[in-house]
Design a protein with these regions (language model features):
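Class I SAM-dependent methyltransferase Rossmann-like catalytic core
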Residues: 1-39
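Active-site rim elements
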Residues: 16-19, 174-182
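Soluble or luminal CAZymes and related metallo-dependent hydrolases
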Residues: 20-28, 119, 123, 183-190
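Conserved SAM-binding loop
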Residues: 42-147, 220
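Conserved class I S-adenosyl-L-methionine
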Residues: 137-164
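Short alpha-helix
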Residues: 177-198
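Short hydrophobic/aromatic beta-strand or adjacent loop that forms the aromatic wall/cage
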Residues: 183, 189, 212-219
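Conserved S-adenosyl-L-methionine
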Residues: 199-210
Length: 222
């Protein structure tokens, strides 16, 4: 199994789940462009690219016209990723280690659906701080806790409270997803609380737009 294949187990190829994921990530890409307005010559760091190649993964690499301006990093060897996107530079990184780039090396840093998997609140704060360190503008997206269906398990509604979430995971045999080391459910308040002090930022809805029940959240730091 590739490093992150388990995160795509719900979205089978050609399924309704995959079609909705593609629609959500296309909107995320549009919001990234609108919020960060990257110019053709500006450099972009994409943190946490996927070893899984499908229409819902690696949206920036699939859609951004200036691929040579992208540096991607991830946990795996990314052999198939590099073959699919030969114009994108790739750096392998280690969990919990600082990003291997100098301060303000990039104009923009982005990360999609990674922050919820880094294991603890402290790790999340460090993850964001590292992105702020290496880039002038930052755009991060995560699944939204209050979307009616939990993204990784397809369990409806139970994830809105910790008690019902733990119970639902136990009943369905999906206990691993109730552990912070696998998944931290993300609300707008929690996401905002992770931002380094003094950083101007905005938290908003993206993905499948349903107001306060939208599928994803974005964090923009400028």
């Amino acid at each position: 199994m590739t490093v992150d294949k388990r995160y795509y187990e719900v979205a089978k190829p050609g399924s309704l789940s995959e079609r909705l994921m593609i629609r959500a990530r296309d909107r995320i890409y549009a919001d990234f462009l609108a919020t960060c307005s990257p110019k053709p010559a500006e450099t972009i760091l994409d943190v946490g690219v996927s070893d899984v190649l499908n229409d819902g993964a690696n949206v920036l690499e699939r859609l951004y016209p200036n691929q040579e301006q992208i540096t991607a990093c991830g946990l795996g060897e990314a052999t198939e990723f590099q073959a699919a996107f030969p114009r994108v530079r790739y750096r392998r990184v280690a969990t919990g280690e600082p990003l291997p780039f100098a301060n303000k090396s990039f104009d923009v840093a982005t990360s999609n659906a990674v922050l919820e998997h880094v294991g603890s609140r402290e790790n999340q704060a460090r993850f964001i701080a590292e992105m702020v360190r290496v880039a002038r503008r930052v755009f991060i997206t995560v699944p939204h806790r209050f979307f009616p269906v939990e993204h990784h398990t397809a369990i409806p509604l139970a994830h809105w409270t910790d008690t019902t979430w733990f119970l639902a995971c136990a009943v369905t045999g999906k206990q691993k997803w109730s552990q912070d080391k696998e998944l931290i459910l993300m609300s707008a308040r929690h996401l905002s609380s992770l931002v380094p002090p003094g950083s101007a930022h905005q938290v908003g809805y993206t993905g499948l737009l349903l107001g306060p029940f939208s599928s994803n959240l974005f964090l923009a730091i400028t």
